[in-house]
C-alpha cells in the first residue's frame, strides 16, 4: 500500500509540476526562431543586397553573445532574484528578444542600416542565450532526480522534439509569410510570440518546478567559477568538450554561399526553401524520438562517430548536387533542395543531443547551469569559427555573388575537413571502456 501510495503521490506531483509546460513552451519558441531568421536572410539579400560573404559574416557574428554563455551560467547559478535563479533569466531573455525583433519590424520599413540591424540581431541572440542557459540548467537539474524518466534522458529528448517542432512550424510558416506578405512580417510575429513567452514566464514560480535543492549560493560567483574550473579539469569532461568543439570548428561551412547559390543562381522560391528547412526540422524531431526510443543506451563515442561519418557523406552529396550529377540522373534541383539541403543543415546539430545527455550525467550537483552553459558556449564558438572559416574558404576558391565556378572545390575541402575529427574520437568519454581499463588494472 505504501509503495502504491508513493507512486500515486509522485504521479500527482508530476501532473502539478509545470516544468514540461515551461520548458515545452520555451524550447518551442527557441526552435521557432528560424521563422524570423529566414526572413532576415531574405531581407539582407533582397533589400540590403549584401553579398554571400557579408551574409555569412552577419549570420555568424550575430551568434557572438552565445559565446558568453558560461558567464550567464555562473551568474544564473549564483545570483538569485526573489529566491529564484532560473525563471528571472528566462523572463529577461524573452523580453530582450521581443524588444529587438519588434524594433527590427518597425525600423525595417524605413532604410535601416546594416549596423543597426546587426545590433538588434546581437541583442536578440543575447536574450536567446539567457533563455537557453536557464532552460538547459533546468533540464540538467531535473536529470539529477532519481526517476525513470530523467534517468533515461526522456526530458532532454522531450525538449529536443519540442524545439524541432518549433523549427518545423517556423520554417514552414516563414517561407509562406515571406512569399505572401514580406520578410518584415516575420519579425513582427516573432516579437509578439517572445512577448507572450515573457508574460507566461513571469507568472510561474520556481518553487512549483520541484527542482532538486542546490548547495547554498552563499559562495557567490567566485565559488561557482572555482567549481566550474574544478569540473573542467576532469579529463572525461574536458576531453569530451574539446572533441565536440573541434569536430565543428575545423569544418568550414559554406551556408551563405549555398543560400546564394540556391536563391540567386538556381532561383529557388522562398516557400520551397522554407519547406526544405521544414524537412530538416522534421529530421531533428524524428532524431529526438529515435534517440529516446532506441539509441540512448548506445555508447556516446560510437553514436557521435556515426553522426560525423553521416555528415561527411551528405557534404559529398552537396558536392555532387552542385556539379549537376543528380540533375543528369533526372533529379531536379528543386527536389534535391526540398528533401536534402535542409537536412544537411540540421545534421550538424544531431551531435548535440547525445552529447548534452552525456554531460548532464557527468556533471556534479550544483554546477549544472555553469557546465551546460560552458558546453553550449563552446559549441556556439565552434559554429562561429566554422562560419568564419567558410568565409575564408569561399574567398580562397573564388566564389562570388555572380561566379560559383569554385564552389565544388570548396565543398570538396569541406568534406575532407569533416573527416578530421574521426581521428580524435578517443577524446569522447566512454564509460564501458573506462570500466574495462579499471578491471585490467585491478
Swiss-Prot record:
Similarity comment text for this entry: Belongs to the major facilitator superfamily. Folate-biopterin transporter (TC 2.A.71) family.
Name of the protein this chain belongs to: Probable folate-biopterin transporter 7
Keywords, alphabetical: Membrane, Transmembrane, Transmembrane helix, Transport
SUPFAM superfamilies given in the database record: MFS general substrate transporter
Function in brief: Could mediate folate transport.
Membrane topology term: Multi-pass membrane protein
InterPro entries hit by this protein: BT1, MFS_trans_sf
Entry's transmembrane regions: 23-43, 64-82, 87-107, 114-134, 158-178, 184-204, 241-261, 270-290, 302-322, 335-355, 379-399, 410-430
Subcellular localization(s) per the UniProt record: Membrane
GO cellular component: membrane
A family per Pfam: BT1
Amino acid at each position: 500500500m505504501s509503495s502504491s501510495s508513493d507512486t500515486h503521490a509522485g504521479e500527482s506531483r508530476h501532473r502539478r509540476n509545470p516544468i514540461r509546460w515551461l520548458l515545452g513552451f520555451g524550447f518551442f519558441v527557441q526552435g521557432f526562431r528560424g521563422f524570423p531568421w529566414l526572413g532576415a536572410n531574405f531581407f539582407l539579400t533582397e533589400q540590403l543586397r549584401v553579398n554571400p560573404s557579408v551574409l555569412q559574416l552577419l549570420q555568424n557574428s550575430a551568434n557572438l553573445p552565445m559565446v558568453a554563455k558560461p558567464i550567464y551560467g555562473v551568474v544564473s547559478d549564483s545570483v538569485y532574484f526573489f529566491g529564484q535563479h532560473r525563471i528571472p533569466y528566462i523572463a529577461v531573455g524573452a523580453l530582450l528578444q521581443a524588444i529587438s525583433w519588434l524594433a527590427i519590424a518597425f525600423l525595417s520599413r524605413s532604410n535601416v542600416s546594416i549596423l543597426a540591424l546587426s545590433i538588434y540581431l546581437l541583442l536578440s541572440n543575447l536574450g536567446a542565450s539567457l533563455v537557453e542557459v536557464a532552460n538547459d540548467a533546468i533540464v540538467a537539474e531535473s536529470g539529477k532526480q532519481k526517476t525513470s524518466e530523467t534517468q533515461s534522458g526522456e526530458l532532454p529528448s522531450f525538449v529536443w522534439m519540442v524545439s524541432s517542432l518549433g523549427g518545423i512550424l517556423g520554417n514552414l510558416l516563414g517561407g509562406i509569410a515571406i512569399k505572401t506578405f514580406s520578410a518584415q512580417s516575420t519579425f513582427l510575429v516573432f516579437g509578439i510570440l517572445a512577448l507572450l513567452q515573457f508574460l507566461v514566464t513571469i507568472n510561474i514560480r520556481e518553487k512549483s518546478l520541484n527542482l532538486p535543492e542546490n548547495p547554498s549560493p552563499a559562495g557567490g560567483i567566485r565559488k561557482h567559477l572555482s567549481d566550474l574550473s574544478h569540473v573542467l579539469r576532469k579529463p572525461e569532461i574536458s576531453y569530451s568538450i574539446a572533441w565536440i568543439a573541434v569536430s565543428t570548428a575545423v569544418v568550414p561551412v559554406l551556408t551563405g554561399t549555398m543560400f546564394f547559390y540556391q536563391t540567386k543562381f538556381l532561383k529557388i522560391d522562398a516557400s520551397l526553401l522554407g519547406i526544405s528547412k521544414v524537412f530538416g526540422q522534421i529530421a531533428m524531431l524524428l532524431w529526438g524520438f529515435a534517440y529516446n526510443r532506441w539509441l540512448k543506451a548506445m555508447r556516446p563515442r560510437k553514436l557521435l562517430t556515426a553522426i560525423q561519418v553521416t555528415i561527411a557523406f551528405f557534404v559529398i552529396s552537396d558536392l555532387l548536387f552542385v556539379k549537376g550529377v543528380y540533375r543528369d540522373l533526372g533529379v531536379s534541383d528543386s527536389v534535391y533542395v526540398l528533401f536534402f539541403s535542409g537536412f544537411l543543415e540540421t545534421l550538424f546539430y544531431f551531435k548535440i543531443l547525445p552529447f548534452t545527455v552525456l554531460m548532464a550525467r557527468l556533471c556534479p550537483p550544483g554546477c549544472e547551469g555553469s557546465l551546460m552553459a560552458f558546453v553550449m558556449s563552446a559549441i556556439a564558438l565552434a559554429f562561429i569559427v566554422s562560419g568564419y572559416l567558410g568565409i575564408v574558404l569561399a574567398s580562397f576558391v573564388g566564389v562570388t555573388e555572380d561566379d560559383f565556378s569554385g564552389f565544388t572545390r570548396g565543398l570538396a575541402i569541406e568534406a575532407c575537413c569533416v573527416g578530421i575529427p574521426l581521428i580524435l574520437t578517443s577524446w569522447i568519454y566512454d564509460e564501458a571502456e573506462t570500466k574495462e581499463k579499471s578491471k585490467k588494472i585491478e
